[in-house]
UniProtKB/Swiss-Prot annotation, chains A, B:
GO terms for biological process: purine ribonucleoside salvage; xanthine metabolic process; XMP salvage. It comes from the Bacteria. Homodimer. CDD domains: PRTases_typeI. The gene is xpt. It comes from Lactiplantibacillus plantarum (strain ATCC BAA-793 / NCIMB 8826 / WCFS1). Belongs to the purine/pyrimidine phosphoribosyltransferase family. Xpt subfamily. It catalyses: XMP + diphosphate = xanthine + 5-phospho-alpha-D-ribose 1-diphosphate. The keyword Disulfide bond does not apply. This is Xanthine phosphoribosyltransferase. Gene3D superfamilies: 3.40.50.2020. 5-phospho-alpha-D-ribose 1-diphosphate binds at A128, N129, G130, Q131, A132. One of its GO terms (cellular component) is cytoplasm. Xanthine binds at L20, N27, K156.
Amino acid sequence: MRELEERILKDGRVLPGEVLKVDGFLNHQVDPDLMFAMGTEFAHLFQDAGVTKILTVESSGIAPAVMAGLAMHVPVVFARKHKSVTLIDDLYTAEVYSYTKKTSNHISIAKKFLQADDQVLLIDDFLANGQAVQGMFEICDKAHVKIAGVGIVIEKVFQTGHQLIADRGVRLESLAQITSFDGDRVHFASEDTQA
Amino acid sequence: MRELEERILKDGRVLPGEVLKVDGFLNHQVDPDLMFAMGTEFAHLFQDAGVTKILTVESSGIAPAVMAGLAMHVPVVFARKHKSVTLIDDLYTAEVYSYTKKTSNHISIAKKFLQADDQVLLIDDFLANGQAVQGMFEICDKAHVKIAGVGIVIEKVFQTGHQLIADRGVRLESLAQITSFDGDRVHFASEDTQA
């Protein structure tokens, strides 16, 4: 998505450890008009996927997910993060390891919000090692729902998350695919196709 | 806002301790179309307030705040919650006590996202004792920005948050004002004006 790539080049900052900081428009300060454009793009990409519900993880996934939900007119459920989980009778839970923070969290959603006939689109702001997506897969499996696809705002294709989703045979659409960092420069997969 | 009140009556559940559970459309599962209608209503209510930025607190405030931001075409910043705060040089922080959870959290936002000429609209999903709003007031004061108003999705007018905002002389607009719970029945301020 050209508009997003341009914004990353303009406002993103590359930090040591191949971390891209985009807190100016995506995950701390949010640009709602850009989010809406992204939601519309997700709706377009998954228009034939029979999506009945969108699932994401708090907090950074919420803005892109609700905009996709607005464009697709389907409900959005955001999984809650906890240090630990108690009283889990009414919850589907999964453990998610964060490579950035080097800690484990549990994510959970109330069972009543996933029905067996749901076709669920998973949305998240970043795809790196795919731990959050894997946690959402686990929750979907426990709920016996069909996964309609995975929609990612910014994907680092050189990390392991991409393969994890491919191995599962689930369709992945990322609005910006970063192939490499070169010092503080960001390279996108779209550069190759444009060349 | 009639549509919101009807949804509360249909899907809300009153729990002991005057807690209204609305996890079916507001703070766990989200109805994006209703959120957009609410965002449009906030934009209408504050159209003459000169709003340059919206501030909210993760996670439940994000969906209504980004929809208001979409309708007003202004950026949205969501404050992060932490158990404790370290490395605060670049952050504005405030302590927020939760009466529901009986714990204190710190909220923070990066200093660079509040400029002295900003006129900030504070948005949150619930107003009860007003602790989150008070935390946002504190952050705005530290940043020397003007507070353009407070927009709340569901207000419990019989708790102390309403007065806290009135005492500060800040304009408050709530899309649903709950005056009392009567067993599992919810009463709105609009019932009085309609009578």
